[in-house]
């Protein structure tokens, strides 16, 4: 079982994720992304879904047209873990190569 990040671990890890923010009332992080169009957003979600399946760690997300809202938390640990940080870093890398909204 994975362990929940301590306050110090959380602070250190989140320094690498400036586009993510804390979810009020939860031990979770979130990010909203905008893409050029629906196809770009769906392609992003597909790449993340493949990685999430490999990790057996799945995001909470919501998609409308070119917007994707992502929330990460580890349910087994009831909070933020290293797995969330790893997936957030992957999401940032994929988003960096996508066509942004104009």
Swiss-Prot record:
Enzyme Commission code(s) on record: 4.2.1.96
Which enzyme class, named as a word?
A: lyase
Which Gene Ontology molecular-function terms are recorded? 4-alpha-hydroxytetrahydrobiopterin dehydratase activity
The record's catalysed reaction(s) read:
(4aS,6R)-4a-hydroxy-L-erythro-5,6,7,8-tetrahydrobiopterin = (6R)-L-erythro-6,7-dihydrobiopterin + H2O
* Short name of one Pfam family: Pterin_4a
Q: Which GO terms describe its biological process?
A: tetrahydrobiopterin biosynthetic process
CDD domains linked: PCD_DCoH_subfamily_b
Query: What are the cysteine partners in each disulfide bond?
Result: none
Gene3D superfamilies according to UniProt: Transcriptional coactivator/pterin dehydratase
User: Which UniProt keywords are listed?
Assistant: Lyase
InterPro entries per UniProt: PCD_sf, Pterin_deHydtase
| Top-level taxon in the UniProt lineage | Bacteria
The similarity comment for this entry is:
Belongs to the pterin-4-alpha-carbinolamine dehydratase family.
Q: What is this protein called in UniProt?
A: Putative pterin-4-alpha-carbinolamine dehydratase
**Which organism does this record belong to?**
Burkholderia multivorans (strain ATCC 17616 / 249)
- Source taxonomy: Bacteria, Pseudomonadati, Pseudomonadota, Betaproteobacteria, Burkholderiales
């Amino acid at each position: 079982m994975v362990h929940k990040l301590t306050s110090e671990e959380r602070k250190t890890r989140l320094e690498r994720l400036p586009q993510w923010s804390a979810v009020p009332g939860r031990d979770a992080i979130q990010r909203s992304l905008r893409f050029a169009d629906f196809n770009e957003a769906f392609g992003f979600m597909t790449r993340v879904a493949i990685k999430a399946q490999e990790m057996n760690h799945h995001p909470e997300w919501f998609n409308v047209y070119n917007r994707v809202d992502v929330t990460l938390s580890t349910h087994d640990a009831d909070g933020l873990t290293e797995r969330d940080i790893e997936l957030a870093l992957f999401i940032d890398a994929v988003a960096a190569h996508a066509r942004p909204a104009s």
